[in-house]
């Protein structure tokens, strides 16, 4: 009966969540996890419209609500339009997960410095700033920024990526201090090597080398990261956690 079903499903106030870079990988897993948990999810993508639509469709199949929004998080106009889309549709924004640009490339050219900074750091700043304006009015909100273990320990050939991700950690600590008086929690999640299209393409030698650096001896799954993000985004038990960096990397940064 309906009553039994209602009892089985815990009541959630359907928080409104914006997930950037949500068409694949970690972002997709986060969007699906939050959608399944009863959130209304804006699925942001930069180029992969078809994949993003699929994510939205899956959330709707779970009985959730979702909309897709194509936009570049390193462009202020796109970010403002994205937040406005969520507010126009659902009236508010409760949670923002800044995941766009979280691609762990093995090597990066120096010429890509600005591009990597714009996507990984400026994007987090712009999205956080736009969301905070909305959250401050209602004195409540949660922001989760996806950084990388590389931002903590560095990696040869990834100076730009490491600098951007370390920047996200420093930025988040400041944002947590600034948002605390308005009940806005800001935390960081630092994934290590997570199984993806890219790890699947690595040669056997490279894979062996990488797995050798991971004490648990395996890649993480996008769902591992999504589970931690869901806790930080929705759980009442996370309400007293702010300004913290959570490493989910199989032990790389021990």
Swiss-Prot record:
GO terms for cellular component: chloroplast. Substrate binds at residue 148. It is found in: Plastid, Chloroplast; Plastid. The active site is at residue 161. Pathway: Lipid metabolism; fatty acid biosynthesis. PROSITE patterns: ADH_SHORT. GO terms for molecular function: 3-oxoacyl-[acyl-carrier-protein] reductase (NADPH) activity; NAD binding. Homotetramer. This is 3-oxoacyl-[acyl-carrier-protein] reductase 4. It comes from Brassica napus (Rape). The gene is bkr4.
